[in-house]
Structure formats: C-alpha cells, structure tokens
A protein has these predicted regions:
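Canonical tetratricopeptide repeat
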Residues: 5, 32, 66, 100, ...
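Helix-start (N-cap) detector for alpha-helical repeat units in TPR-like alpha-solenoids
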Residues: 27-28, 61-62, 95-96, 129-130
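Terminal, low-structured helical/coil segments at or just beyond the last alpha-helical repeat
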Residues: 107, 112-150
C-alpha cells in the first residue's frame, strides 16, 4: 500500500479522533485508525489499536483479522495463524480469515494446510478465485504452487 500523504493522514486522523472523542470505545474508528497507522508505516501503533479492540470486544473477528495480517507483514507467522484461528472460531463463515490463514500457513511452510484453507475460502466466497490467482503469482504456475485448488 502506498503511504498516505501527510495532509491526507492528518485529515483522516482528525476525523477518527473526533469520533473517538465522542465515543472512546468505537471499535470501527479504532480499527480504521489502526489501518491508517499501518499504511503509514506505524506498525506498533496499529498493533495497539487492534489489540485494544480485542480487549473491548473479544468477539470482533475483524480485529483478529487485521492483527493477523499485520503479523504476517512482520513475519510473525505462528502468531498470525493463531489470530486467524480466533477469527474463524468467532465466525466459521469468514472467508477472508481462511484465505489469510492459508497465506500464513503457506509462508510458514505448511502447503497442505494452506491448500485446505484456500479451498474453504473459495467455497465460502467463489468470487475470490481471481484474487487468489494474483496472490500466488510469485510461486510459479498456480497448479504447482497450490495443487488441488486450481
């Protein structure tokens, strides 16, 4: 993701801060603030926001997803997989959590587990196949990268 320019960043943060001033436990605003911080290279601050949402509402599967995605980028693959497990436990039909867990498993060397998760993701969201085509382009022909899916 491209870094936000300084003006955009300041405007977004002002808007988010205004919402949080009215309701300090507004989960969506905290998640958005985390995403803005993450896209601006502030991973530790983003992590704090995502974790805070899981403390306020341990049933917010989106917070576990975002934190897991951040951990993939930080190469904390085992931790990421655990967070995706949590998101899936909260919402067994959460296709994006299966996809991201599959990506983390693949990066962690668990090709079979990755294939299983990707199949489940496609079962839940068949429109995602085009997105998966690009996801694994660096792994060689998709039939070799993830046999059994394509």
């Amino acid at each position: 993701e491209a870094l936000l320019n300084l003006k955009q960043y300041k405007e977004m943060m002002e808007d988010i801060d205004a919402v949080l001033a009215q309701n300090p436990e507004e989960e969506t605003a905290m998640l958005l603030r985390g995403k803005v911080k993450e896209s601006n290279g502030q991973g530790e601050e983003a992590e704090e926001d995502y974790k805070l949402v899981t403390e306020i509402n341990p049933f917010n599967e989106q917070a576990y997803l975002y934190l897991g995605q951040l951990y993939i980028n930080q190469k904390k693959l085992t931790e990421a997989i655990g967070l995706f497990d949590e998101a899936i436990e909260l919402n067994p039909n959460f296709a994006e959590a299966y996809k991201e867990r599959g990506r983390a498993k693949l990066l962690n060397g668990d090709k079979d587990g990755s294939v299983e998760d990707m199949k489940k993701s496609l079962e839940l969201n068949p429109k995602e196949e085009a997105g998966l085509n690009g996801e694994f382009k660096n792994l060689g022909p998709k039939s070799e990268a993830l046999p059994g899916i394509f």
